[in-house]
Amino acid sequence: MYTKEQLRRLLIPLMFEQVLTALMGSVDTIMVTNIGSAAISAVSLVDSLNILIINIFAAMATGGAIICAQYLGSNQKDKANQALKQLIFSVTLISLIITIPCILFRRPLLSLIFGSVEKNVMDNSLNYLFITALSYPFIALYNAGAASFRTSQNSRLPMTIAFGSNILNILGNIFFIFTLSLGVAGAALSTLLSRIISALVILTLLKQPKQDLYVDSYLSIRPEIETITKILKIGIPTGIENGMFQFGKLVIQSTISTMGTTAIAAQAMVAMLESFACQASIGIGLGMMTVVGKCVGAKEYEQARHYTISLTRLAWMVCIIFCAIIMLFIQQITSLAGMEAESAKLAIWLTRIVFAYKMIFWTPSFLPGYGLRAAGDVKFSMITSTLSMWICRVVVTIFLVHTFHMGPLAVWIGMGADWTIRSFIFLARFKSNKWLEHKVI
């Protein structure tokens, strides 16, 4: 169904977009390192919560994109456009429902998740959460718009917007953090501004009728329960999977937060780099959902299998390259970030251990899941990922920390166990072909 040129046009912009999106969070973390460990700790802690919430929006966008892709694959363009409208309605409503309590109850929320942290870390965290929470509706709408353009095979546009957003974010950080000396609040303001502009741009461009998916009028959107239900059948299990995954990270983060600012700062840097190393591969996974979704909609099941295998192999190669580059330059990265000596030493040591294992097991533990979800096999993915994460990451980490008094290394031992077990389960599910037996539209 796809030529090599079509795949290149879809995947290369997606890879760049994901890398650029990751840079937005990374820039905040790196730039606040210059104002102390309390600042980097605050950004790291709150971003753990932010990622949890943003992944809920991403799950909704995924549900809508899969529905749209299968409708387009079966040549039902009108229904695909209607699904897009319902996606926009859904993410707007859900984002507002989440934003309001996160702002009003941010202190008890942070205390509940992270427990007792140093006062200056908590003060910075409260400011950072208040401002970044205001951006939730805008990142939700941007995700919905970006997903629709990817489904229309126009992944270059979201990449271009992401590039502009990152430039704006960097300039904003320079102005707010260093010129106005606003600290973590400056980093948050820059992120908020860039997300508002990104959402407005993509929603404006989404009104152009020349593309496969478009919205003729936002004011005319009314809820349609049947279409929303189809989106939620994909979005809710995916959201639970993503949400539980990030919630598990928060539980682990709360354990790390009691180890002091040196461990928190080192863990934050390694976690940021680990996430960054797989962003291009995640871009391939997002492209896989579009490709496999259209194949399944057209009932081309062998093509769906073929693209899942070939794109997983490509993502594996890309992940290895990124990991190798980061391992090679980790000392320079920590120096450039201005990390304190003890935090930098710990971060370098952890990175070399973690990335050697990540090269082997990360890709097969994640990429096949994109193909499964595109075919509608979301419950299996949700159950597998949730159980593996809680048993391996959370239980193993807490056990190692409290029994053997390990530091941040315990987190990565648990994560490595999760990657390994998940890899074998997903590969077995893929070979069984049961993932192709679901009906979505």
Model-assigned labels for residue ranges:
Residues 61, 131-150, 158-166, 187-202, ...:
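Short runs within selected transmembrane alpha-helices of multi-pass transporters and secretion channels
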Residues 32-51, 119-124, 184-185, 227-234, ...:
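Interfacial/gating helices of multi-pass transporter permease domains
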Residues 23-41, 110-119, 175-184, 243-276, ...:
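Helix-terminus/linker motif at the lipid-water interface of multi-pass membrane proteins
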Residues 2-30, 34-35, 51-63, 67, ...:
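N-terminal transmembrane alpha-helices
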Residues 9-28, 131, 165, 194-198, ...:
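Transmembrane helical elements of multi-pass membrane transporters/channels
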Residues 40-100, 139-158, 264-330, 361-385:
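Small-residue-rich hydrophobic transmembrane alpha-helices
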Residues 1-14, 68-135, 179-236, 292-358, ...:
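Short alpha-helical transmembrane segments in multi-pass integral membrane proteins
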Residues 52-55, 169-173, 199-203, 276-279, ...:
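Hydrophobic transmembrane alpha-helices of multi-pass small-molecule transporters
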